[in-house]
């Protein structure tokens, strides 16, 4: 199973990749939505772990562009937001 991790915080990006790799997944990593679009043009993924708040393009905008282009890859969102207004 091939997973794309899209997370701008370098330590969390590295930890996610290391953990998923240790579980036997093939993992690619990138740091924002714009970079993720480049990865998605060149490869197919079974799942995407996607941060909500990122520079250049946030996770919601990336997901919207993916769906508009017909990409139905399952997405797992990550966020540090925890208050009701943030939801």
List the model feature ranges, each with a label.
Residues 1-87:
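N-terminal/domain-start alpha-helical segments
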């Amino acid at each position: 199973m091939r997973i794309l991790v899209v997370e701008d915080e370098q330590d969390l990006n590295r930890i996610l990749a290391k953990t998923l790799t240790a579980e036997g997944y093939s993992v690619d990593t990138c740091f924002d939505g714009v970079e993720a679009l480049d990865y998605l043009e060149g490869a197919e993924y079974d799942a995407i772990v996607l941060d909500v708040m990122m520079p250049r393009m946030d996770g919601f905008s990336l997901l919207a562009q993916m769906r508009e282009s017909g990409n139905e890859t399952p997405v797992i969102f990550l966020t540090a937001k925890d208050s009701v207004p943030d939801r």
